Amino acid sequence: MVRMLTEPPADSAPRAAAVRSWRVRLPTLAAACALLGGCGTPYLMQAASGEVHVLHERVPIDTVLADPHTPAAVHEHLERVRAAREFASQELGLPDNDSYRSYADIGRPYVVWNVVAAPEFSVAPKRWCFPVAGCVAYRGYFHEQPAHDLALTLESQGFDVAVDGVPAYSTLGKFADPVLSSMLRYGDDDLAATIFHELAHQLLYVRDDSEFNEAFATTVEYVGLERWLAHQGATARMQAFRDEQQRERELVSLLTAARARLEQLYASPLPRDEMVAKKAEVFTQLSVEIRALERRQGVTYPLYEEWIAAGLNNARLASVATYFECVPGFMRLLHEQGDDLPRFYAAVRKLAELPRSERHARLCTPQTTATG
């Protein structure tokens, strides 16, 4: 999951070096390779090695909390994490397993760096296919430099490319995913939302459909956080969350409108030079619109400011669509089920059995993809 809208201060992750002496039983590299369907390529080998490193750092949260050397900030975060984790299973119907009941201090701000790419004249993301996850709209690396190396290669092939750090990910229940130190860079409510999101992936994951999977998990994240705040009687935080959701909807509306303009442009028979110029105009206009929205809302979106500074492109809009395009459809489905989560999950499972095109016709704007 990528936290799309806000970025915490750099180097704000609390450290818990004292707990590193505790270890849970290690999966072997062979087990990680089996999960990935083999480690016959350097890419899969780095993925397996990175996963083993994360799992090697796991410490039971109860152990961390009992350790008198645990920094106060880590202790406070993990106390709240433990409560949110119980709420996730007891009240949201999310998997009751060992995931997010341990902590891993990974010593860096992100656990992986995702590469998203789209053709020069398309907002459909390039897809990469893997044995377990199926085909997804990104390629992740446990170290930053290889992600940028791939980005340079793709750019040389004519793709628009984006590289983003990711604070959390899910192994879809294959391993007991820990709470990562990279996740503690965010506020406690964002941390709870991240756990709800990642557990939703464990509850339901459809091969070869990133948009469906991410929108489902984002919907569970939103609903779960609202119910978690209501459970705590956190009226002020609830209002802040709703205000943030409204700001997010306005921002996503700008991004999806720009995406629609580009889709129309790319479908036109314009000469290449003219299309390049008009593409640049769309992104210039979007930059102006984002900054006007920031002024009107009285907020700043650091992540999007970074995007503007680096140059907006098709890959940026493709990544936003992956997380948000189908969310309104999932929210409608939830309301149709009387806002009852078990009924909602059952309805989503039925949709998951349909062909991808039919799922998207019911929930999302159908879209094509570039394959490679």
Q: Each PLM stretch: what is its role?
A:
Residues 54, 67, 74-81, 140-147, ...:
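Solvent-exposed, acidic/flexible segments
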